[in-house]
Every structure is written in structure tokens, then in C-alpha cells.
């Protein structure tokens, strides 16, 4: 498939940082977790979600996890995507629910509302309306775990990181003591220049 991958380990972050900041990518957090009191997870997508869940599963207190989310996302309910007999009615029912929601919607916003009402989509916080959908999938138990995090920083994209603060475009946020910053901000898949599927002797899938 003609697409480009973009993960924290192999790309330069879209923000700058001071040299004395304790910093790692999601790919290497297992090797660097020891010796810190707080963990600042930068990135609100699936990688950020999985990193927060991994920290919780490894007995880090929710109070010591600080999740920087530039934009909240609509999330797919995992039970609707399981190819197992136990989830047959959930998965097939979700397909019907999606078609019904799309057919009955009067706008894009209304469509997302209807998909949420039917249990197809989930969100982290009922008080915060998501503004993106990249297809990230979570279970209802994972969602409940994420909802135990009291410190979710919603100030847009990080511009610069120093030991004492995160700099955003319009504000700053004070860093907790002895914190490890975990970069989960890569977009995973990026768009490339459009190409014709059939071009002479070349086929681009």
C-alpha cells in the first residue's frame, strides 16, 4: 500500500526541547521508566492511549500520569470489531447501526452523535466534544481506565519543552517534579503525493 509510516522512534518531534529534559519515545519507555515520580505523555492518539494504559497496568498512580492531548478523538468501541462468535451480534449490529446513523444524519456532527448514541463510538470525556477521528480503537474497560486520569492537558500542540514547563502556542503548563516526558505525538500514517494507480509499467496499490 502506498503510504508513509511515522512513529516516535524514527522521526523528529514537531516540538523542540532543552537538553536537560528527561525524554523518551513510546517505543523505548519500557527501558527508561525507572527513577521518575511523574510521567508526561505527549500525544492524544492511539499511541498515547496505549502508553497511558501501560503505565496504569504497571502500577503507576493515575495522579502521576499527565496526558497532553492536543485534540480529543472519537474512538471505536472494540467490542464491535471482534471477529469472534461471542461478539457476533455486536459486530454485525454495529454495521447496521452505522448505516442507520449515516442515513438518518442531517450533518457530520449529527452523524457522530448518532454513532455515539448507538455505541459505535466512544469518547474520553462527555464534557469535551472530539474534533478528530483517526480510527483508534479501545475497549470499554480501557476507556474507564483512561477516565481515572485527573490530569489531562488540553492546550493544543506542544511547541517547546523545558524542565519546568511545556510551552504551547498561547499558554504554558508547569511540569511536575522529576518527570519523564514520553513522546507519542507521531501521526503513525502520513499522506503522500497523489499518484496514479496505473502509470506505464508501474502499479501503485
Question: Predicted segments — roles?
Answer:
Residues 37, 150, 178-180:
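Conserved acidic residues
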Residues 1-59, 65-66, 203-204:
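Glycine-rich dinucleotide-binding loop and its adjacent helix/turn
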Residues 56-163:
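Dinucleotide-binding/catalytic capping subdomain of oxidoreductase cores
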Residues 1-2, 69-70, 184-186:
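Short loop/turn segments at strand-loop or loop-helix junctions that form parts
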Residues 159-162, 167-205:
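Glycine-enriched catalytic-core subsegment of oxygenase/oxidase enzymes
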Residues 51-53, 76-80, 192-195:
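A short acidic (Asp/Glu
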Residues 5-8, 75, 190-192:
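Glycine/Thr-rich phosphate-binding loops of Rossmann-like dinucleotide-binding domains
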Residues 46, 50, 137, 141, ...:
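Short, well-structured alpha-helical interface segments that form or flank functional binding sites
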Amino acid at each position: 500500500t502506498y503510504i508513509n509510516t511515522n512513529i516516535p522512534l524514527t522521526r523528529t518531534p514537531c516540538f523542540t526541547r532543552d537538553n536537560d529534559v528527561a525524554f523518551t519515545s513510546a517505543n523505548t519507555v519500557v527501558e527508561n521508566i525507572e527513577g521518575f515520580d511523574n510521567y508526561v505523555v505527549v500525544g492524544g492518539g492511539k499511541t498515547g492511549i496505549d502508553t497511558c494504559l501501560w503505565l496504569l497496568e504497571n502500577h503507576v498512580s493515575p495522579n502521576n500520569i499527565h496526558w497532553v492531548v492536543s485534540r480529543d478523538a472519537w474512538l471505536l468501541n472494540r467490542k464491535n470489531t471482534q471477529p469472534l462468535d461471542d461478539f457476533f451480534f455486536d459486530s454485525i449490529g454495529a454495521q447496521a447501526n452505522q448505516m442507520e446513523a449515516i442515513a438518518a444524519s442531517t450533518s457530520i456532527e449529527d452523524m457522530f452523535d448518532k454513532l455515539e448514541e448507538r455505541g459505535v463510538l466512544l469518547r474520553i470525556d462527555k464534557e469535551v466534544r472530539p474534533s478528530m477521528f483517526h480510527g483508534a480503537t479501545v475497549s470499554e474497560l480501557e476507556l474507564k481506565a483512561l477516565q481515572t486520569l485527573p490530569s489531562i492537558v488540553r492546550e493544543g500542540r506542544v511547541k517547546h519543552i523545558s524542565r519546568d514547563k511545556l510551552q504551547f502556542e498561547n499558554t504554558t503548563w508547569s511540569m511536575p517534579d522529576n518527570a519523564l516526558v514520553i513522546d507519542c505525538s507521531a501521526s503513525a500514517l502520513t499522506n503522500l503525493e497523489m499518484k496514479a494507480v496505473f502509470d506505464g509499467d508501474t502499479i501503485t496499490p
